[in-house]
């Protein structure tokens, strides 16, 4: 029986308050309006950005359905939708690509002005929600909200992918893999023979290691306080792994001594102000490029000496690995299908959706790289 045009009742993980577990609730998902798409979720990854909301370091309106790294199948479309149709395999896009704003029209930029990152509204682009629970509207997260059996997104925030692609793997291309990999190959533009340092060896950090290797870096130094992640980092391309807790001097000084004055490229993939500064300081003062990849704590500032940049360093940041989401995500899936890279090493756990809180416990304890939830 077709559900198109009807309200769908399903299960979703609702975050009612920060610092509290998710609650599996019965929610109502309204039909898509014009230029919107309703998706039946199949797989979803647990990303550190979701946990930033739970911990309160990333502020978004509550109550909310989180989740933004996923794959699913189009259930129905609203009036005017032309780029996907019911039955298509898709990846929801936490960073939209409207194709019309000044950023979308700039070839090397991807931070579409329709995003819900800078000043989160917690709604779709028309300013309203499609979720209801206990008679109350529930907020969206980054315009996608994939911790739900069904979700509604704007057409500019969904990409059709290869019908043969395994959704339990390519869902990672919806955030973690593309963010890390792109930070190396597209944002920093790592050069062959260069030296790189990657701070943080979660799913995104390890994807950055993969990007550095793909770009031809000669040395890739992985930095983390969890030594259990070193074997995986070396498997994916790290040439050396170091733990800051093993040294009495600041880690940036250790890295500078190891690399004749500093690395060519550094990546902060944690989201801490102290490691952002260490990442900047460890790159060479005359030619180093440092990329902020981790989401920083809300409303906190860094103070730096401008001389650190005057000598020739470049300090930059990017969302989504610099990729233009709607056009580049299908290309990355095609590359995966062509075996240009593997995602297997990033997936350490697979759990049923109902065990979402267990999945977040694995993340917080450092026992997982990526946990995939299946519906």
Curated annotation (Swiss-Prot):
Q: Where does Zn(2+) 1 bind?
A: 47, 68, 175
Is-annotated flag, keyword Hydrolase?
no
Query: What reaction is this protein's catalytic activity?
Result: a primary alcohol + NAD(+) = an aldehyde + NADH + H(+); a secondary alcohol + NAD(+) = a ketone + NADH + H(+); butan-1-ol + NAD(+) = butanal + NADH + H(+); 1-propanol + NAD(+) = propanal + NADH + H(+)
| SUPFAM superfamilies in the cross-refs | GroES-like, NAD(P)-binding Rossmann-fold domains
Q: What is its main location?
A: cytoplasm
Record key words, sorted = Acetylation, Cytoplasm, Metal-binding, NAD, Oxidoreductase, Phosphoprotein, Zinc
Cofactor(s) this protein requires: Zn(2+)
The record's annotation in InterPro entries points to:
ADH-like_C, ADH-like_N, ADH_Zn_CS, GroES-like_sf, NAD(P)-bd_dom_sf, PKS_ER
**Which residues are annotated as modified residue Phosphoserine in the UniProt record?**
23
Where, by residue number, does NAD(+) bind?
Answer: 48-52, 200-205, 224, 229, 270, 293-295, 318-320, 370
User: How is the cofactor bound here?
Assistant: Binds 2 Zn(2+) ions per subunit.
Q: Which residues are recorded with the post-translational modification N-acetylserine?
A: 2
EC annotation? Answer: 1.1.1.1
Q: Where found?
A: Cytoplasm
Alphabetically, the GO molecular function entries are: alcohol dehydrogenase (NAD+) activity; all-trans-retinol dehydrogenase (NAD+) activity; butanol dehydrogenase (NAD+) activity; zinc ion binding
> What GO biological process terms are annotated to this protein in UniProt?
alcohol metabolic process; retinoic acid metabolic process; retinol metabolic process; secondary alcohol metabolic process
Q: How does it assemble?
A: Dimer of identical or heterodimer of closely related subunits alpha, beta, or gamma that are encoded by genes ADH1A, ADH1B, and ADH1C, respectively.
Q: What does this protein do?
A: Alcohol dehydrogenase. Oxidizes primary as well as secondary alcohols. Ethanol is a very poor substrate.
Protein name in UniProt: Alcohol dehydrogenase 1A
